[in-house]
């Protein structure tokens, strides 16, 4: 059995400049997957860019809980957002048993809020791409509660 290295161009949908670089990396054989953040304004343009320049490229869902705004109504996921309705940065999260060193704060997102936002991001991905994600990964941080949400959404 041969092994295959999967190199993911994470954060696809973050900005036009980044997206152009990710597509270039895919077309030149550096990246094998484009991993889409769906909670950005750029996400629809990123999908269009992929469809025009490399429609064969596999897209993954890059679940984001700690940068920018959520897909869900912020009022429905209070443990994930600040008073402006933006995600708490990963540096504000509690460092849990998984020991992510960037997490140095007091924010502890609940399983229910993580699950609700993940489901919203899966739905948004399906709206943008026209199909459910075949691969899902996390942006920036991973916690045990996030793993539970990933398993629940399955």
State where each predicted segment sits:
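Active-site beta-loop-alpha junctions enriched in small/polar residues
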Residues: 10-12, 37-41, 62-66, 139-141
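Active-site gating loops and adjacent loop-to-helix segments of metal-dependent hydrolytic enzymes
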Residues: 70-107
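Structural preference for beta-strand elements that scaffold enzyme active sites
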Residues: 4-6, 31-35, 56-62, 133-137
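Catalytic domains of cell-wall/extracellular-matrix polysaccharide-remodeling enzymes
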Residues: 111-112, 119-154
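Boundary/entry segment of secreted carbohydrate-active catalytic domains
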Residues: 1-16, 22
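Acidic (Asp/Glu)-rich catalytic clusters
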Residues: 22-28, 44-58, 75, 79-82, ...
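Short, acidic/polar
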Residues: 15-23, 114-124
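A short alpha/beta connector and helix-capping loop motif
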Residues: 16-42
């Amino acid at each position: 059995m041969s092994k295959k290295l999967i190199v993911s161009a994470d954060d696809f949908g973050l900005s036009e400049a980044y997206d152009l670089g990710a597509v270039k990396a895919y077309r030149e054989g550096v990246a094998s997957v484009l991993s889409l953040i769906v909670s950005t304004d750029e996400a629809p343009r990123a999908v269009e860019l992929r469809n025009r320049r490399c429609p064969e490229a596999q897209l993954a869902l890059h679940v984001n809980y700690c940068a920018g705004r959520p897909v869900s109504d912020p009022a429905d996921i209070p443990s994930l957002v600040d008073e402006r309705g933006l995600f708490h940065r990963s540096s504000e999260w509690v460092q849990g048993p998984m020991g992510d060193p960037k997490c140095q704060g007091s924010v502890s997102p609940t399983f229910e809020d993580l699950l609700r936002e993940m489901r919203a991001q899966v739905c948004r991905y399906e709206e943008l791409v026209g199909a459910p994600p075949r691969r899902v990964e996390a942006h920036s941080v991973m916690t045990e509660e996030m793993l539970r949400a990933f398993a629940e959404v399955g």
